[in-house]
Every structure is written in structure tokens, then in C-alpha cells.
């Protein structure tokens, strides 16, 4: 695949729902058992309204978009920057909106911006910028 013969979309949107079950599964996969992510009472002691989703779980969802949708198969991340604006809590549906902001034929790559908003209230949760090799 290359930039000149691409057939991937310039924009893509997908909704992911964060669940407590996802947090438990992710803790087992990653070995990160920080109670902030797994224990509601502990999270509340720290001032949060509920358990806080793993940042790396969000990155896994970003990987789904990059590897399967925009640009898709054969894509390889070379750079990722992400900023979380608000915590993501269990039972929250998050709308991921991806758009290509730049293409380079020289490096056969794209720059991709992906933002995450709560599906219900449209609160901005994170912004990310990536360089993806095609």
C-alpha cells in the first residue's frame, strides 16, 4: 500500500464502550493492578467519581482504528502523542473521531488526529496525533 494508491477514508468515526469487565481484563493482560483502575472506593478516596480507565486501553482502541480502518492493514505507527483532558470512567461510550491532517508521498506516511468525546455529552476526553507509515 502507498499514498498514491490509497483507498482508505480521510475521516472515520467509531464508538467504544468502556466497561468494568474491560478494566479487569486489561489488568490481567498488562499486569497493572493499580487500584485506581479496579477499585471504585479507592478511586473515590482520590477524588474521582469512579474507577478510571487505563490510558493504555484507550491506546489499544486507537490501534484498532489505525490498524483496521484508517489507514488499515499494513499500517505502522511511527509516532503517537496523546493528551487526556478528563478521566474516562466505566460504562462510558466514547466517540473516536479520526481524520487525516497531512499526507507525505516522500515518507509514504500520514498524520492522523484522533479525538475522543463522550457520546452522551460530547465532552472532550483526549486528543491524539500520530504519524503512520503506509
Report each predicted region and the residues it spans.
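HotDog/MaoC-like acyl-thioester-processing domains
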Residues: 1-11, 88-134
Amino acid at each position: 500500500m502507498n499514498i498514491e494508491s490509497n483507498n482508505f477514508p480521510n475521516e472515520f468515526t467509531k464508538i467504544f464502550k468502556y466497561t468494568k469487565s474491560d478494566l479487569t481484563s486489561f489488568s490481567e493482560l498488562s499486569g497493572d493492578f493499580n487500584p485506581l483502575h479496579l477499585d471504585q472506593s479507592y478511586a473515590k478516596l482520590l477524588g474521582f467519581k469512579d474507577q478510571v480507565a487505563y490510558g493504555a486501553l484507550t491506546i489499544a482502541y486507537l490501534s484498532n482504528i489505525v490498524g483496521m480502518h484508517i489507514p488499515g492493514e499494513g499500517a505502522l505507527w511511527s509516532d503517537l502523542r496523546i493528551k487526556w483532558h478528563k478521566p474516562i470512567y466505566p460504562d462510558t461510550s466514547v466517540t473516536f473521531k479520526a481524520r487525516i491532517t497531512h499526507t507525505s508521498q516522500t515518507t509514504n506516511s500520514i498524520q492522523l488526529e484522533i479525538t475522543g468525546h463522550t457520546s452522551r455529552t460530547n465532552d472532550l476526553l483526549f486528543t491524539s496525533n500520530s504519524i503512520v507509515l503506509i
